[in-house]
Amino acid sequence: MATTYATGKRKTAIAKVWVKPGSGKISVNGVDLNTWLGGHEAIKLKVVQPLLVTKQETSMDIKATTLGGGYSAQAEALRHGISRALAAMDADFRALLKPKGLLTRDSRTVERKKYGRRKARRSPQFSKR
């Protein structure tokens, strides 16, 4: 099997992901996943979730680059990218990932600020008199 490329997105974060058969090494922005996360186990579980669902955690090598957003958004973009790459590799993986919602792009983004208001929805204090 050759290397499969996919992109994942979340908020303003973008992850470019290359997945190939291997020994289970995950490299993000040139460093190991654990180093990149700095010991955040909850976020690590989020990133490797597609591999756990498809039972491929020790048989796929992943190389990824992320940009934009924060750590959490980048991790979710990475999860989305890994899911899409696995689905492109094998149709059986798609059948496992789809019901878990891992192939769905989370479209929630920051609401824009409107004029005449302080923030997106917060308006100036109203005084009757």
UniProtKB/Swiss-Prot annotation:
Keywords recorded for this protein, A-Z: Ribonucleoprotein, Ribosomal protein
MF annotations from Gene Ontology: RNA binding; structural constituent of ribosome
GO cellular component: cytosolic small ribosomal subunit
Lineage start: Bacteria, Pseudomonadati, Campylobacterota, Epsilonproteobacteria, Campylobacterales
Protein family membership: Belongs to the universal ribosomal protein uS9 family.
InterPro entries, A to Z: Ribosomal_Su5_D2-typ_SF, Ribosomal_uS9, Ribosomal_uS9_bac/plastid, Ribosomal_uS9_CS, Ribsml_uS5_D2-typ_fold_subgr
Single biological process term from Gene Ontology: translation
Pfam families cross-referenced by the UniProt entry: Ribosomal_S9
Name of protein: Small ribosomal subunit protein uS9
Segments traversing the membrane: none
Extent of Basic residues compositional bias: 114-129
Superkingdom classification of source: Bacteria
Keyword Ribosomal protein belongs to the record: yes
PANTHER family attached to this UniProt entry: RIBOSOMAL PROTEIN S9 (PTHR21569), SMALL RIBOSOMAL SUBUNIT PROTEIN US9M (PTHR21569:SF1)
Encoding gene, per UniProt annotation: rpsI
Entries under PROSITE patterns matching the protein: RIBOSOMAL_S9
Region (Disordered): 107-129
